[in-house]
Amino acid sequence: MKLKAVLLGILTAGALSAGEVSVAAAANTTYAFDEIKAEFAKLHPQTTLNVSLGASGALSTQIKNGAPFDIFMAADMKFADDLHKDGFATAPAKTYAKGKVAMFSVRGVDLSKGLEILKDPSVKTISIANPKTAPYGTASVQAFQKAGVYDEIKGKIVEAKSIGEALSQALKASDVGFIAASAMYAPKMAKDGCNDKPCKQGENFVLVDTKLYEPIAQGMVVLNRAKDNAEAKAFYDFILSDKGKEIFAKYGYEF
């Protein structure tokens, strides 16, 4: 009987420690999330982590309309802070990483010429994320305007729903894509866009001068439905931990 009681106690404790965390995350974090999920699972093997990726504005709208998320990881501070101001989050946003914009092409475009190459007649299509809903799209337009090329190239711009879709367009159809630099550090991109070699700065992509766009500080909030969710708090703390920063740093993010 004592053995049964002990076993029952162990099983009950295991059941109590199990749980789920639903995360809405900006599409630029896609590649980093493979490693984030793996490392978090090592620390919390009983927790199921569900991740939905998309444009920050679209995810924010879903949350306001009742989508059942516990954590929101935006591509900027505004979308995350606005959820707190509007009463959907438990506390103001905290910055978990700072992203960069990269110019990428698989069409042999001479990226060494910088944004000026976009005016060349050979460049007919330029993919960016929707600047109304995706902060990386906003940053791309800011860069075009500050560099003085926007008026001449605006007719070439193709807006994607998210930064992930902008990358997909750059791989499949567009001459140039303005994407999250994090994608360029992902092993998967070596196969998809860099001839089975690690993507090389100056060859496969160039970083857009950060002086041309507002810093992309990315904010995270715990949403109200997770205020008593210990697993959600554990994930939030993990993202802000040294290990979380180590993972993001691998993908070119800064802090």
Predicted regions and their residues:
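Exported/periplasmic ABC-transporter solute-binding proteins
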Residues: 18-43, 52-53, 57, 61-65, ...
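Gram-negative bacterial Sec-dependent N-terminal signal peptides
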Residues: 1-17
